[in-house]
A protein has these predicted regions:
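A short, N-terminal "cap"/entry segment at the start of jelly-roll beta-barrel domains
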Residues: 1-76
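Double-stranded beta-helix
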Residues: 2-12, 137-182
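Conserved short histidine dyad/triad with adjacent acidic residue
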Residues: 61-68, 79-96, 134
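Short histidine-centered beta-strand/loop micro-motifs
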Residues: 68-73, 91-96, 113, 121-123, ...
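Short, conserved beta-strand element in jelly-roll/cupin
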Residues: 77, 82-86, 95-115, 158-159
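A structural connector/turn signal
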Residues: 80, 90, 99, 119, ...
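Histidine-centered metal-chelating micro-motifs
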Residues: 89-92, 110, 128-130, 134-141
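Short acidic-glycine-tyrosine-enriched beta hairpin
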Residues: 103, 115-134
C-alpha cells in the first residue's frame, strides 16, 4: 500500500521553516536558569510544547518561556532546539522521559552522565553525536576553553510530543541551598 501524499502551499510550508535569524532565544524558565554555571540561551526550533503536570524539578527541556514559543509549532514525535553558551556553562545534571541526542554545531562540548555516583564524560566537537537513553542523568557544558569569551552552539533533539526534564536530586538541593528554588 503506498504512503499517503499531501500537498501544501508555499504559505503553509513557510510555517514549517525556521530561519535562525528569526528564532527568539530564552535564558530563563528552568530551575537552574539563575545558577551562575548554568547560564545559557535556549532556542525552541521544532515542537517543545509545555508538558502536563510540572513541579519545581520537572519542566519542559527548553524551559517555560521557550516552550511557549516554538518556531515550528508541531507535535510529530520529536523536538529540536539549540543551546548557546560560553565555556564552563551548561545545564545542571538532569534527565528526560525520552531520548536526548546532542550534536555540537560549533566549539567543543563535554557531555556527561551519572553512573554509580560519579560522572562519565565524552568531549565532542562539531557534528559529533551522543544519544542518551531515557532516564539517564545527563548534562552538557561548553568546553571551548581556548575561546573564553565566545559563545558556541549545540543542537539537541528530544523524542516525544511533550517531553519532560527533571533535575537530579543533587542539582535541586544545590539550587535550594542557593535560594534559587523553593
Amino acid at each position: 500500500m503506498p504512503l499517503p501524499t499531501i500537498r501544501v502551499t508555499r504559505d503553509e510550508m513557510r510555517a514549517r521553516v525556521a530561519l535562525f535569524s528569526e528564532i527568539e532565544g530564552f535564558d530563563g524558565g528552568l530551575p537552574d536558569s539563575d545558577h551562575p554555571d548554568a547560564r545559557r540561551t535556549l532556542y525552541n526550533v521544532v515542537g517543545f510544547q509545555p508538558p502536563d503536570g510540572s513541579d519545581a524539578a520537572t519542566t519542559s527541556p527548553v524551559g517555560a518561556k521557550a516552550a511557549e514559543k516554538a518556531a515550528i509549532k508541531i507535535s510529530e514525535g520529536f523536538n529540536l532546539g539549540y543551546c548557546k553558551a560560553r565555556p564552563g556553562k551548561g545545564p545542571m545534571m538532569h534527565n528526560h522521559d525520552t531520548n536526548e541526542t546532542f550534536i555540537p554545531m560549533t566549539g567543543r562540548w563535554e557531555c556527561s552522565w551519572e553512573v554509580d555516583g560519579k560522572a562519565e564524560t565524552f568531549e565532542l566537537g562539531p557534528h559529533d553525536v551522543i544519544s542518551f537513553p531515557p532516564g539517564v542523568q545527563r548534562r552538557f557544558m561548553n568546553a571551548t576553553w581556548d575561546e573564553p569569551d565566545a559563545e558556541h552552539l549545540m543542537m539537541f533533539v528530544i523524542g516525544g510530543d511533550g517531553p519532560k526534564a527533571e533535575f537530579s536530586p543533587d542539582a535541586m538541593a544545590e539550587l535550594r541551598d542557593r535560594g534559587l528554588v523553593d
